[in-house]
Amino acid sequence: MGLNLLPIEMDDIRKRLDREPNEIEWRVIDAVWSEHCSYKSSKIFLKSFSIDSPNVIMGIKDWQDAGAVDIGDGWAIVIKVESHNHPSAIDPFNGAATGVGGIIRDIISKGAKPIALMDMIRVGNLKIRKNVWLLKNIIAGIAAYGNSIGVPVVGGELSFDDTYNDNPLVDVAAIGIVRKDKIKPSIVDKAGLKLVLAGLTGIDGLGGASFASRKLSGEDEIGAVQIADPFAGKIILDITLEIADKVEAIKDLGGGGLAVAVTEMANGLGAIVDIEKIPLRVKNMNPADVIISETQERMLYAVEEKNVEEVCKAFEEYEYPCSVIGEITSEPIIKFRYFGKDLVSLPTNALLEPPKFLWPIKNVRKNVEEKNVDLPLESTIYTVLSHPDLVSKEWVYSQFDYEVNTSTVVKPGDANGAVVSLPNGKLLAIKADGNPDLCSEDAYECGKGIVAEAYRNLATVGARGMVAVDHLQFGDPKKPEVYYTFVEAIRGIGEATRFFNIPIVGGKVSFYNENSQGKPIKPTPLIVMAGLVQGKLLKNRVEDSSYVVLLGYTRKELGGSLLSKIFKVPSQAPKVRLQEDLLSSEVVIDAINEEKITFAKDISRGGLAASLFNIIVHGYGVEISTKSILSDTDNVVENLFSESSGRFVILTNEPEWIVEKSRSKGIVASIIGKVNKKTSILTIDNTDYDLKTIVNNYFNFLEEVIGNG
């Protein structure tokens, strides 16, 4: 049967049923109990993310399709993050496009209107042509769906590493807006509701949930990848929002198809589904395939019988298939019938409560012997600043219609966080952050670090983080070293979100990101954080003669840094000091509201040098004195490329105000230099470094490699 179930799981369900499941039931169990759908190796840890917050309307403990938080004035935002990693490795265009479609349907399943998308893409070395092909088609897929459906892509991440040569990661986050009293659940609480299915069911995406719950074998069928139809997706979006008041619950048909959607929507009650009533794209489909098909652009609604006609009429106006396929029952049994014959009859609770697993762990935290860095400064600057992770992503953003719906306030690339306007007049900032290199060194510090970095990035536009979702991407959890990094990353994320009092209201776990030889990717947890602008919004601008102020203390912590990655520098990973991140962020927000700064950049990937380079690409020069840097090392390379947390580079005409404000908060700040008109020149301790070639690389790299690839 090609099942992914473990022998212990098969024995467990036999005992619970006191019988042998039939072949179709095995396929249903395989889908519902898949790691992709059940979180059987992770759910016990995810509960630690739950934070009681008065703003949370729908959180992680509710375990619904998306999280929701109150933003005031009767409004709520809905937020979700998802991935389509395995499908994108096989068919990058449709894999990425259907990832966008799926997350949009998760947002509208709450009755919310999607207002923003973010994409976080990680691929392998671009010297390998396959990776160029993957990236180009991933971007094309995201653009094709997002542009067609009318939801702007407002930001994201793009990074490169050999670890993703066979396993690209394609993450998509979405934000929606809804009146808080109009939020729809994905589950029901009473029997008698009719199950209404919108959309055609085909043979694409068969076994997709199971496919996503194992490593890539090199022999996977492209049939496991769903086919995107953005125009149908637009119809689903518009009509779902139109009929939301007429339905009791809404659920996207994602992983596991109807098998999972019906089971989860029943929420401990039961359901009867008549397979012959399901509209098909392909004639004479096998009933078992109909149950687990993951054809896109389908939604399941639980509807009072009196409203069924009105709901389906809305779809009929667009000639979009809509059919009553069953109903919710009081008997806690999930039944799929075919012309009156039960093909599947399984207890709801048995399906919803798979065996949970705690796998062995092996401590892989590295103890590194510190050595003095002895690298030539000039070539080190040129090499690090030329790295693809640091180049402009403008070519990528240009593929997206990021201004559709006119809610985008800060266009992608113009700041460290995306900013969109809300119906209540407030501004919402959004940022995604991950750091797989740091996670490879110390997953616990990495977990703290990505939360802190997202928080700092929001501060640079004047926002304070208020809600987050996480995406945890790892290899095979049964491997002790993989499971250890997973558990440690969760520990770090949980500690940081509790410190900042930022509830995680949802997320995703993606295991089995391995190549055909069983080599896992670097641990890649991701945080997407959103927060309201607290007063004034900062749109970065560079002015001649502005003072360069370094906010925060620099430490010789190069482990997991871009410098360490390129030059194999042995060093300890940074210790994330959350109090410093919080206080330095407060200084930045205060300075923005007092209009004391014109530019703010958190120091992260590439260290201080990369942040200074971010000023230079605006058409200016920068001169600094490394002797002014407050640090525990006098090594110039270490000071320039350390990625210690809690730091910012800011531009101001009132540097003493910044220093005094920082001192009042208990944070160090130092005036390290000035901006000048020496275009593309970085002056360090009175020595000029001409970065003109690096600046050209910054603006043209992606178009030259991908656009012409």
UniProtKB/Swiss-Prot annotation:
Positions annotated to bind Mg(2+) 1: 82
Active site: 36, 84 (proton acceptor)
Reactions listed under catalytic activity: N(2)-formyl-N(1)-(5-phospho-beta-D-ribosyl)glycinamide + L-glutamine + ATP + H2O = 2-formamido-N(1)-(5-O-phospho-beta-D-ribosyl)acetamidine + L-glutamate + ADP + phosphate + H(+)
Record key words, sorted: ATP-binding, Cytoplasm, Ligase, Magnesium, Metal-binding, Nucleotide-binding, Purine biosynthesis
Protein's pathway: Purine metabolism; IMP biosynthesis via de novo pathway; 5-amino-1-(5-phospho-D-ribosyl)imidazole from N(2)-formyl-N(1)-(5-phospho-D-ribosyl)glycinamide: step 1/2
Protein family (similarity comment): Belongs to the FGAMS family.
Pfam families in the record: AIRS, AIRS_C, FGAR-AT_linker
Residues the entry annotates as binding substrate: 83-86, 105, 226, 294-296, 510
GO molecular function, one term: magnesium ion binding
Lineage: Archaea, Thermoproteota, Thermoprotei, Sulfolobales, Sulfolobaceae
Residue positions binding ATP: 39, 80, 470, 507
InterPro entries, alphabetized: PRibForGlyAmidine_synth_PurL, PurL_linker, PurM-like_C_dom, PurM-like_C_sf, PurM-like_N, PurM-like_N_sf
Principal EC category: ligase
Any one GO CC term of the record: cytoplasm
GO biological process, one term: 'de novo' IMP biosynthetic process
Predominant localisation class: cytoplasm
Cited Gene3D superfamilies: PurM-like C-terminal domain, PurM-like, N-terminal domain
Compartments, as annotated in UniProt: Cytoplasm
Binding-site positions, Mg(2+) 2: 106, 252
Organism: Saccharolobus islandicus (strain M.16.4 / Kamchatka #3)
Subunit details: Monomer. Part of the FGAM synthase complex composed of 1 PurL, 1 PurQ and 2 PurS subunits.
Descriptive protein name: Phosphoribosylformylglycinamidine synthase subunit PurL
Function (record text): Part of the phosphoribosylformylglycinamidine synthase complex involved in the purines biosynthetic pathway. Catalyzes the ATP-dependent conversion of formylglycinamide ribonucleotide (FGAR) and glutamine to yield formylglycinamidine ribonucleotide (FGAM) and glutamate. The FGAM synthase complex is composed of three subunits. PurQ produces an ammonia molecule by converting glutamine to glutamate. PurL transfers the ammonia molecule to FGAR to form FGAM in an ATP-dependent manner.
Enzyme Commission no: 6.3.5.3
